[in-house]
Amino acid sequence: MQAKIQAILQSREILGKEPRVYMQGYDIPELSARLFPVKTQNGLYLAVWSGEEKNVFERPSLVWREKDEVCAVYPFSFSNYLRLTRFLAHLKPSPFNHHPSFGCGDRLGMVSAAHLKALKEFPVFPVIAQQSPRELQKTRRSFADVLLGAAWGILESGYQGTFGADADHIKDEQDLLEARDLGYSMFTLDLSEKVNYRAFAMDERELSRRYEEMNAQEQEVFGRYRDKKFTLSLGVEVDLSEEKLLPLVLAYLPAVEQVEYWYHLLREELSSFDLEISLDEGESITSPEAHFFMAEELHRRGIDFRSIAPRFPGVFEKGIDYIGDREEFSRALWTQVAVARDIGGYRLSLHSGSDKFSIYPIFFRETGGLFHLKTSGTSWLQGVAVVAEKN
C-alpha cells in the first residue's frame, strides 16, 4: 500500500503541488480495486489502483502502469461521485435515525471532516450537507457543490456511518426539485412567506367579511376545529374557540396547502425522506394553537413530516449566544414540546443554533433529547479567524 501511495505522490506534475493521499484508502471488491482520495492545490481526485483500467469513472486526469497494476486518477466531479456511491453506499445521504440530529452547515465546503470528527463521540445523527438557496447565492455555490463537499469530508475522515443532506429554507419549487433530483435526504420548507400573518391584525369587521368570503375548503377546515379545546398531557391548553380559530385558519391554511403540494412533488421520486416545517422566520412567535393546527392538519392530509421549527421568543443570531430571557424561552419551549409529544411522530427543531450555549441544556432537557439542531455560522467564522491569523 505504501508503494502505491508513493507512486501517487510522485505524479505531482499532473495533480499539482503538495498532493495529500488519505492513507486509509477504500477497498472496492466489485472492481478488484483500491481507491485513494487525493487532495491537491489543483483540486480533489480519486486514485484507483487495479489489475486493469476500469471504465467506471469519467475523464481520467492521469493513467500509468506500475508492474502488473494500473493506477487511474479521476477528478472528484459530481458525476464521478454518483458512480462511486454504487460501491460506497454510505456516501449517499439517508433520512434520520432514532438519535437526535445535528445539522452542520459548511459554508466553505472545507470542514465536513472536522464536523464529523467533532460529532463522532456523541449519539447524534449528523446532517453534514446543509445550505439554503440564500446561502448558496452569497457563497456562489450550488446544491451539488454542497453535497460533493460533504461526501469528500466522509472520504477524508474515513467515516463509515450514515449522514443527512438538508436542502435548507426552501421557498420555491425550482430549488426543491433541484435538491430532490440530486439525492438530498432532508427538505426544510420555509413557510415565512406562505403564512398570512396579516390575518392576526384584522379587526372584527374584516374578519367577519373574510368569514363570509370563505371558500368550501376553508369552511370545511374551519368547521372541523371550531370551538374545540384541548388539554394536553403536560397541562398545556390549546384554545380553538371561534375568535381564535378564524385568523388561525386564514393565516396558516395557505401554508398547509403549500406543504401538501411540495410533499407530493417529493413523493413522486422519493420513497423515504425527512421533511421539516420551518416557521422560525415568521413575523410572530409560534403559539401552541398554531403549532397544533399545522401539525394536526398536515397529519390529517397524510403528510409525514419529521420535524418542525417554531419561532421562539428571543433573538437568534448566527455565531453568538441566545439573546433573551431564558425562563421565557423555557416556558415557550414547554408548550411546543407538549403539542409535539401529544400529536407525536416528529421532533422539534432549533434554527440558528450556533453557539447558543445558554439554552442548549434547556432544549435538550425539555425535548427529552429528541430534537434537531441547526448550526452554520461558527465554522465559517472560525475559518475567517484562521485566515486572518495566518495571512
Role assignments for model-derived ranges:
Residues 164:
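N-terminal glycine/serine-rich phosphate-binding loop of ATP-dependent small-molecule kinases
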Residues 190-196, 201-259, 317:
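Active-site cores of enzymes that catalyze phosphoryl transfer or operate on phosphate-rich substrates
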Residues 1-149, 155-157, 173-195, 200-204, ...:
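Active-site capping/gating regions of soluble enzymes
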Residues 273-275:
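Short, conserved phosphate-binding/catalytic loop or strand-edge motifs used
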Residues 168, 277, 351:
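Conserved, mostly hydrophobic/aromatic
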Residues 151-152, 277:
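A generic local structural motif
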Residues 279-281:
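Short glycine-centered, acidic/aromatic-flanked micro-motifs in structured strand/loop junctions
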